[in-house]
Each structure stands twice: as C-alpha cells, then as structure tokens.
Amino acid sequence: MTQEPFREELAYDRMPTLERGRQDPASYAPDTKPSDLQLSKRLPPCFSPKTWVFSVLMGSCLLVTSGFSLYLGNVFPAEMDYLRCAAGSCIPSAIVSFTVSRRNANVIPNFQILFVSTFAVTTTCLIWFGCKLILNPSAININFNLILLLLLELLMAATVIMSARSSEEYCKKKKGSMSDGTNILGEVPFPARVLKSYSVVEVIAGISAVLGGIIALNVDDSVSGPHLSVTFFWILVACFPSAIASHVTAECPSKCLVEVLIAISSLTSPLLFTASGYLSFSVMRIVEMFKDYPPAIKPSYDVLLLLLLLVLLLQAGLNTGTAIQCVRFKVSARLQGASWDTQSGPQERLAGEVARSPLKEFDKEKAWRAVVVQMAQ
C-alpha cells in the first residue's frame, strides 16, 4: 500500500515534457485550423451563381444593344447622333459586367459610380431625342431607334438598381490578429507600375488629341462643326485629372486615393466612350472615301476625325482599365482578410509587431529548454 504513490510518480502516463511549461493545457488550441488552409480550387466557396449569371446577362445584352445602336446611328448619322452617344456610353458598363463575372465575390457595388454616370448619359440622350422630336417632328422616324434607346435606358436602370441592392460579400480568411494589426497595402501588392504606364500614355494621348483637334479646326471653316469643340473639352477634362490621380496613387497608395481614382475613372470612362460613339461616323466616311478612286479632294478632315476617334478610344480603354485595376486591388485586399474600412497606421502595425515578437521568442526558448531536459533524461 505504501508503494502505490511512488508507482504513480514513476508512471509514464503523465503530461509530456514539452507541455509541462504551459499553464492551461486544456485551453491549448493549434494556431492553424484546417479551414484556414487555402487550397487551390477552380471555383471558390464564396462564388455567387446569381451574381455571375446577372453579370453575364447584363454584359451580353448591353453589348448586343450597343452594337445595333451604333450600326443604326451610323446608317443615319445626322438624324440619330443621340443613339450613337447612348450606345458608346454603355460599352464600359458591358466590359465591367464581364469583369465582374470572372471574380469570386460580389464586386458590383464597387462600380456603382460608373453605372450611375452611364445611366445619366443615356437619360441625357433620351432627353436629346425628345428635344429633336419637338423641334422637328417630321424629320425623325419613331421606329427601331426609340426601341433601342429605351432598351439601353432600361438595362442601365436595372444595373443601377441591382448594384444598389446588392451587398458586398467577401471571403475573409480567419487569421486572428492579422486583421487587427496589419495594413492592407502591405499584404496585397498594388499595381503601381501598371497605373504609372497608364498615366504616361494618357498624358501623351491627351496632348496629341489636343494638337490634332487644333489642326482639325483650322483645316476648313466650312466643314468644322460643334462636335469637335465638345470632344476636345471632354478630352481636356477627362484625360489629365485621371492621369495625375493615377500617378499620385501609384506613388503613395492609400485607401482615400484608391477610392478617388475609382470615382474619377468611373466618371470619365463613359464620357470618353460617348464622344467616341459620336465620332464613329468618321469610319463610314473613310470607307466611302476609299470606295471611289481617286479619293475625295478633302480627305484630311475625315482622317483627322478618325485619328481623334482612335485617341478617344485609347483614353476610354485606359480609364476603364484603371477602374478595374483599382477595384481588383480593393477586392483582393478584402479577400486577404484585411479590414478596408478600418485601416491601421504604420505606428499601430509596428506596435503590434513589437507586442507579438517577445511572445514568439519566449515560446521558442521554452520549447528548446524542454527538449534539452528531455534529452538529458
């Protein structure tokens, strides 16, 4: 009976040596969980089929309707100029819809400014059509053009409503203290080189467009129209602010600058595509000019309009790409588990690292001592 306590002390069914230094063995939990392991999957668990179907459907409908509207507007260039503008303004929304469909999260609310600005342009084109109908009712045939214009308006209205009603659902990793003490700009790489290259090309294209516009205005006073001055105005307004904002954001990325750049690009992209749609009649003029040989006496004006159209398309594409890159960075930051709304500064992050580092060093030292003791035994 007296040997039983000694047998209990010499038994090997007690706590392991590495676990003796811990105060509460029952509360021990591993640092990583099986759900935290990011396995390579083709279809993420947060994928939304409704968002994907809606994005593909809206993008397809907008592309088809814009294509028919551009064709009909170029068949009747003087009577249906409003239809070309409305069709051009809907192109960035269609591009963004296909971009959203490839994402694994609901990013439609991030493009809400672009959808609202496009809806404003289509509404203006509808008012433009009504004013032309009031001023000269006999010159406009209310047929397929009104159907296309109303269809564009309804599609954009549905897109705006869905973007306002949809909620941002993101797959956030459960990383414990990482979401509390880390900065999103330190975790997710910002596309600084891409935005810098975009800004350089935008400045060069804007200066070239201004010079080409001045030359086009001085070619012949009889052929110059008001559409040139309006187009140049939008180039000057839309090009340089977005280029400057892209360069500043690439140099010093932050939440505020990224949001401002998304807003500027979302506003300028539909306007540039609208001007491109208005000048699309120059393509038909160039085609008609090369049908007859020798060409017309005044081909330089139409060629300059075509070059201006290409510059506008380049500017519009770069602005749309800038918006997509910024939204992609924003979504990637949220997918990494970082808090986009409450962002900690460098001092808080440094304090968190200093607070965590002594604990890690203490754990390593204690584990090493336990190993040495076990080897000695």
From Swiss-Prot:
Gene, per the UniProt record: MLC1
Source superkingdom: Eukaryota
Entry membrane topology: Multi-pass membrane protein
Major subcellular location class: membrane
TM annotation in the entry: 52-72, 82-100, 111-131, 142-162, 199-219, 228-248, 257-277, 304-324
Modified residues (Phosphoserine): 177, 179
InterPro entries referenced in this protein's UniProt entry, alphabetically: Membrane_MLC1
Name of the featured protein: Membrane protein MLC1
Location within or outside the cell: Membrane; Cell membrane; Cytoplasm, Perinuclear region; Endoplasmic reticulum
Record flagged with keyword Metal-binding: no
UniProt keyword annotations, A-Z: Cell membrane, Cytoplasm, Endoplasmic reticulum, Membrane, Phosphoprotein, Transmembrane, Transmembrane helix
Residue spans of biased composition, Basic and acidic residues class: 1-23
Species: Macaca fascicularis
